[in-house]
């Protein structure tokens, strides 16, 4: 299925500060940095995978907690690769379950 699995890819990108917190002025920017657990190209698009070790009762809780984080990961990958992220997957290790966002 995958062509090349990329792991632990660090990134730093500039985003409007108001995107992180609406109380910031529109013209200010902040740096967002992180490490993307895994991703792979699938055709002309990308599948993003994030592993979570949180102990939760259901995977849906992880969606609420990490939706914004994965949106930043998506933005970083799309900027650096020029490809569209077609799927974001959170893999809940404690539940042995995947959640597609």
What are these regions (language model features)?
Residues 1-101:
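Structural signature of nuclease core domains in nucleic-acid processing machines
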